[in-house]
Regions:
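Sec-dependent N-terminal signal peptides
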Residues: 5-13
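Acidic, polar-rich low-complexity tracts and alpha-helical solenoid repeat scaffolds
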Residues: 2, 15-208
């Protein structure tokens, strides 16, 4: 919760600053876009993410200055994330990355994508796909932005994912051992040793 509030405040501060700049540049031509953005910001601060997303999306279409349109798009995505509309948020973030590839908030967009994939992890015993997808997105971020402030958070999440994946492999290996299927059991244990050497399950895999 603290992390989420921190990110909200960070984004609000950034966008408020840009809105003031925007008003200074062309107040007559841009007043409509600024008004839409401000309505979105007010709704966002009140927790009305549905309405906020609508206004930020409208603001993006009305801003002629690319920097402000891009920031409106980011806020629309974050509003969708706030109401757990994960697929819509991801679609909007992917569109943002294609439309504004040079925007200074691209790093944050990739972080939010990784975060959304991570939060879609439910029961790894039934479905490994969300785990694998989240791991890939987090890995991409860590390789692309290793020194980012967000890297610490994602490294922690990656460690949790790696342990979950290793636990699944060990569970399957134990099943094969119990049924005396030695070759697939060894293959599963080898996978833990090769791919998850930093997890808490490495010692058990080595001693099996």
């Amino acid at each position: 919760m603290f992390r989420k509030i921190f990110l909200i405040l960070l984004l609000i501060f950034s966008l408020q600053s840009c809105s003031k700049k925007e008003a200074e540049y062309e107040p007559q031509e841009k007043i409509s876009a600024y008004k839409l953005y401000q309505e979105g910001l007010d709704a966002f601060q009140q927790g009305n993410y549905f309405y906020a997303e609508k206004k930020f999306s409208e603001a993006e279409l009305n801003f002629e200055i690319v920097e402000f349109a891009a920031k409106s798009s980011i806020m629309a995505s974050y509003s969708l994330y706030g109401i757990n509309f994960y697929e819509s948020a991801l679609d909007n973030l992917e569109r943002y990355l294609k439309t504004y590839p040079a925007d200074k908030n691209v790093l944050y967009a990739h972080y939010l994508i990784a975060l959304i994939y991570y939060e879609q992890i439910s029961d790894e015993k039934k479905d490994l796909e969300p785990l694998i997808n989240a791991d890939k997105k987090i890995d991409f971020f860590l390789k692309t932005y290793p020194n980012s402030d967000y890297a610490i958070d994602l490294k922690f999440k990656k460690d949790l994912i790696q342990n979950q994946l290793a636990a699944k492999e060990l569970y399957v290996a134990k099943f094969y051992i119990s049924t005396q299927k030695w070759v697939p059991a060894i293959n599963r244990l080898k996978k833990i040793i090769d791919n998850y050497e930093k997890t808490i399950f490495i010692e058990e895999a080595l001693h099996r």
